[in-house]
């Protein structure tokens, strides 16, 4: 399933998505990820985190490590993958996001769009079952947005389970099975993209769409 979470700033979108791998702690209710309940049990948290990849608004790459080292760090330390195997996997995913030639460079030598594609490749190196994207294009120059969205569309077409917080409504229309609209910490409306965009039920959703699609 590919879910897009939309809503105005401060509506709780990023907090919701960060709860799914315990970067934020939920106060009530249950979060169950692939059959494992996210509780205060550290074993459960580690298990879920190892299966949930996350790509942030700001790329969060280690500036003192090469692109290849950024991609192999977690598999080597967390999954205990042999270095050679980790490097082969990293090159596979760097090719997938179309920047294998950048492997030996440092993050500061890459454009924002390239760094975000590295961040996606780095997450994929852990072979996650679910990918979380927290406004992955909002810090990018307009001409770099397409290259990141193209990578995400390709992932979606290959069947990756994805939750994506984004204002890119064209991406939501093209890729999502379901669009969730949040406001003031609540899910106001959720529906299939066609129904969500063409026939929104809530007045708050209608206002949001008129503002974001009117530009």
Question: Residue ranges of each PLM-predicted region?
Answer:
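C-terminal boundary and immediately downstream tail of ABC-type ATPase nucleotide-binding domains
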Residues: 190, 194-215
């Amino acid at each position: 399933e590919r879910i897009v979470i939309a809503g105005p700033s401060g509506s709780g979108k990023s907090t919701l998505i960060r709860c799914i791998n315990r970067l934020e702690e939920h106060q009530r209710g249950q979060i169950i990820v692939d059959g494992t309940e996210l509780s205060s049990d550290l074993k459960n948290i580690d298990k879920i985190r190892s299966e949930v990849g996350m790509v942030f608004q700001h790329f969060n790459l280690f500036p003192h490590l090469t692109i290849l080292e950024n991609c192999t760090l977690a598999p080597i330390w967390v999954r205990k993958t042999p270095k050679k195997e980790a490097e082969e996997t990293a090159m596979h995913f760097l090719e997938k996001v179309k920047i294998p030639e950048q492997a030996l460079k440092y993050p500061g030598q890459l454009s924002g769009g390239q760094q975000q594609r590295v961040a996606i490749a780095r997450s994929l190196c852990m072979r996650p079952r679910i990918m979380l994207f927290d406004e992955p294009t909002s810090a990018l120059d307009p001409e770099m947005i397409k290259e990141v969205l193209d990578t995400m569309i390709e992932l979606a077409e290959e069947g990756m389970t994805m939750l994506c917080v984004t204002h890119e409504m064209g991406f939501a229309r093209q890729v999502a099975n379901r669009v969730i609209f949040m406001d003031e910490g609540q899910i106001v409306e959720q529906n299939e993209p066609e129904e969500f965009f063409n026939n929104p039920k809530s007045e708050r959703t209608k206002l949001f769409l008129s503002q974001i699609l009117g530009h």
